[in-house]
Amino acid sequence: MFLQKLLVYLTAACMFCYILVLSATLNVLKVLSPNLARKLILKMGEKVTMTQNPKFSYEDWGLTYGSLAFIKVASQTMWLSLGQEAFVGEDAPDSPVVTVDGERTSICNYLKGNRPLVLSFGSCTUPPFMFKLGEFKQLVRDFVDVADFLVVYVAEAHSTDGWSFGNNFDIRQHRSLEDRLSAARILVQNDPLCPVVVDEMSNVSAIKYAAQPERLYVLQAGKVLYKGAMGPWGYNPQEVRSVLQKMR
């Protein structure tokens, strides 16, 4: 566990430095060579499915890269990741969550015997999360006989009062549990085919699972069986599919 936590701290420090250098570089290029800046941002967007998402144009999101809002949100994400406690082979954190009906429960209450539990963390304002919702729903359809699924709604990735994107869901950052529940109900309208719960306003689940802005896990018998890389680039339902296929 010590080495895992040390790696977390080193990774966060490296990512923070990367964010600062990237932002400075992009802002210089936007002045000296706008076309090159655009190419670099589009390349980064391709890795997180922004360029593949027909809902968004470059102007909706690309111009925000390197902004103060970009730096602030990315830095906050790295800071929250320092509190993670979910590691492969270790006990799964039984963090508290709230159902969309307002009932308080916890993540491990959704574990059933030896059946795997797939956790999908995200929010409506996270375009890669919503873009891959169809892929996630297909996972549910294909493996409902093998595993259970749970969506955990966390703080907004791109709230209208934060690092906002054009043509995105118009949701402000949650100020209360009711705000978060209201946002989660918008996701429920998209029928994720599994239960949806929300993180507490302390963001305890997002912290313990390092799940901001999005992340995938597979739990089994109280342990972490699979831990996807941090989103948006690491949110890969195909990796979960590979894990579940081995359990048939």
Swiss-Prot record:
<dbReference type="GO" id="GO:0042446">
    <property type="term" value="P:hormone biosynthetic process"/>
</dbReference>
<keyword id="KW-0256">Endoplasmic reticulum</keyword>
<keyword id="KW-0712">Selenocysteine</keyword>
<dbReference type="Pfam" id="PF00837">
    <property type="entry name" value="T4_deiodinase"/>
</dbReference>
<keyword id="KW-0472">Membrane</keyword>
<feature type="transmembrane region" description="Helical">
    <location>
        <begin position="7"/>
        <end position="29"/>
    </location>
</feature>
<keyword id="KW-0560">Oxidoreductase</keyword>
<dbReference type="InterPro" id="IPR008261">
    <property type="entry name" value="Iodothyronine_deiodinase_AS"/>
</dbReference>
<keyword id="KW-0812">Transmembrane</keyword>
<dbReference type="GO" id="GO:0042403">
    <property type="term" value="P:thyroid hormone metabolic process"/>
</dbReference>
<keyword id="KW-0893">Thyroid hormones biosynthesis</keyword>
<comment type="function">
    <text>Responsible for the deiodination of T4 (3,5,3',5'-tetraiodothyronine) into T3 (3,5,3'-triiodothyronine) and of T3 into T2 (3,3'-diiodothyronine).</text>
</comment>
<dbReference type="InterPro" id="IPR027252">
    <property type="entry name" value="Iodothyronine_deiodinase_I/III"/>
</dbReference>
<dbReference type="InterPro" id="IPR036249">
    <property type="entry name" value="Thioredoxin-like_sf"/>
</dbReference>
<dbReference type="GO" id="GO:0004800">
    <property type="term" value="F:thyroxine 5'-deiodinase activity"/>
</dbReference>
<comment type="similarity">
    <text>Belongs to the iodothyronine deiodinase family.</text>
</comment>
<protein>
    <recommendedName>
        <fullName>Type I iodothyronine deiodinase</fullName>
        <ecNumber>1.21.99.4</ecNumber>
    </recommendedName>
</protein>
<feature type="active site">
    <location>
        <position position="126"/>
    </location>
</feature>
<dbReference type="GO" id="GO:0005789">
    <property type="term" value="C:endoplasmic reticulum membrane"/>
</dbReference>
<keyword id="KW-1133">Transmembrane helix</keyword>
<dbReference type="InterPro" id="IPR000643">
    <property type="entry name" value="Iodothyronine_deiodinase"/>
</dbReference>
